[in-house]
Amino acid sequence: MNLFRFLGDLSHLLAIILLLLKIWKSRSCAGISGKSQVLFAVVFTARYLDLFTNYISLYNTCMKVVYIACSFTTVWMIYSKFKATYDGNHDTFRVEFLVIPTAILAFLVNHDFTPLEILWTFSIYLESVAILPQLFMVSKTGEAETITSHYLFALGVYRTLYLFNWIWRYHFEGFFDLIAIVAGLVQTVLYCDFFYLYITKVLKGKKLSLPA
């Protein structure tokens, strides 16, 4: 495992922990898209169904368990524990427009037409657009809390580092995964506008807002 992959995993883990702490400490999930979190739970479930059949390393297994557990814990807090604070009126993105096309694409474009491989491919495609309901919600409300901005920024850094990970692997290992790279590029592009606003506003102590 190279440094970019490791730092990407740490950034991803930091994003998840920031979100969980934000919800738990404030006793509120206001400003958080439950739909995005459900999509992420679907992503990790589909991707890591090989948990009991494909052992790579203790690190790999632990990260899989943490991602699945944290994603479902987040969904539980939003839709059960702190349901009264969930802003469903602004979380209105039509997720079927994300799930159905990515599922169809996974059947059509994959590395191997087997159940686990199709599910893995589906998770890669879906993850690339899973943040859209959250960005749509921020755009609709006009602003985001600072901690939510930190969460989104950490996710964006994770995806950017993973792109460097693919470049590293291609250069030093000769490994090239076009599906993962293209999906990663799509996801990184979605964060570009947010990165600019984060750097120009949040890091200067201002509140983040996206164009409506």
Swiss-Prot record:
Belongs to the ERD2 family. Residues 204-207 are annotated as: Important for recycling of cargo proteins with the sequence motif K-D-E-L from the Golgi to the endoplasmic reticulum. Keywords: Cytoplasmic vesicle, Endoplasmic reticulum, ER-Golgi transport, Golgi apparatus, Membrane, Phosphoprotein, Protein transport, Receptor, Transmembrane, Transmembrane helix, Transport. This is ER lumen protein-retaining receptor 1. Phosphorylation by PKA at Ser-209 is required for endoplasmic reticulum retention function. The record marks R5, E117 as: Interaction with the K-D-E-L motif on target proteins. It is a multi-pass membrane protein. The keyword Phosphoprotein applies. Residues 1-4, 53-58, 111-116, 169-178 are lumenal. It comes from the Eukaryota. One of its GO terms (molecular function) is ER retention sequence binding. The modification Phosphoserine is found at S209. Residues 25-32, 80-92, 136-149, 200-212 are cytoplasmic. It is found in: Golgi apparatus membrane; Cytoplasmic vesicle, COPI-coated vesicle membrane; Endoplasmic reticulum membrane; Endoplasmic reticulum-Golgi intermediate compartment membrane. The chain crosses the membrane at residues 5-24, 33-52, 59-79, 93-110, 117-135, 150-168, 179-199. The lineage of its organism: Eukaryota, Metazoa, Chordata, Craniata, Vertebrata. Upon ligand binding the receptor oligomerizes and interacts with components of the transport machinery such as ARFGAP1 and ARF1. Residues 47-48, 159-169 are annotated as: Interaction with the K-D-E-L motif on target proteins. GO terms for biological process: protein retention in ER lumen; protein transport; retrograde vesicle-mediated transport, Golgi to endoplasmic reticulum. InterPro entries: ER_ret_rcpt. The record marks D193 as: Important for recycling of cargo proteins with the sequence motif K-D-E-L from the Golgi to the endoplasmic reticulum. Receptor for the C-terminal sequence motif K-D-E-L that is present on endoplasmic reticulum resident proteins and that mediates their recycling from the Golgi back to the endoplasmic reticulum. The keyword Transmembrane helix applies. It comes from Bos taurus (Bovine). One of its GO terms (cellular component) is endoplasmic reticulum.
